[in-house]
A protein has these predicted regions:
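Long, domain-scale non-catalytic interaction/scaffolding regions in large secretory-pathway
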Residues: 1-152
Length: 152
């Protein structure tokens, strides 16, 4: 059920932050329509089990948000690590990569708060595709996009 999931971490660390385009933290639970911002996901291999191969990062975004496809929009000011392969869909981004022992990678997705309303933002998940003991999940939350001028 939406809003009842819990964070879980097994042999992998996962931190999700939302920031303005200038890199300042932003509260995504209450955004003004038209706001551009980014999701920043940092994944760390604690190093105990060596190199992790074939990790899959799944990010599904709230229905009221739109993904700004940096490749199509010719945007290059949101710098982050580059995955081995990335699949960008209407409401989600799948990133696939390897992660060395003790290594950290940060992936960034540019977003826009497009449609007024309250939406559920699903949790972010990262896992090894062929080893179910390597997984991390950060819970989702409810978010609201308000008309311009409604947020004081």
């Amino acid at each position: 059920k939406a809003g009842t999931e819990t964070d879980k971490f097994s042999n992998l660390e996962l931190i999700v932050n939302y920031k303005t385009l200038n890199g300042n933290p932003i509260d995504v639970t209450n955004l003004e329509q038209g706001t551009d911002f980014m999701a920043e996901v940092t994944i760390k291999n604690p190093g105990v089990r060596g190199m992790y191969r074939n990790l899959a990062l799944s990010q599904i975004f709230a229905s009221g948000w739109e993904i700004r496809n940096q490749r199509l929009d010719n945007i290059n000011y949101v710098k982050g690590d580059v995955p081995t392969y990335q699949d960008i869909r209407d409401d989600r981004v799948y990133s696939y990569f390897d992660l060395g022992a003790g290594a950290i990678k940060t992936f960034k997705v540019l977003l826009n708060a497009s449609y007024n309303g309250t939406y559920y933002l699903p949790g972010v998940n990262c896992e090894a595709m062929y080893d179910n003991s390597v997984t991390a999940h950060v819970s989702g939350k409810w978010v609201t996009v308000r008309k311009q001028g409604e947020i004081q």
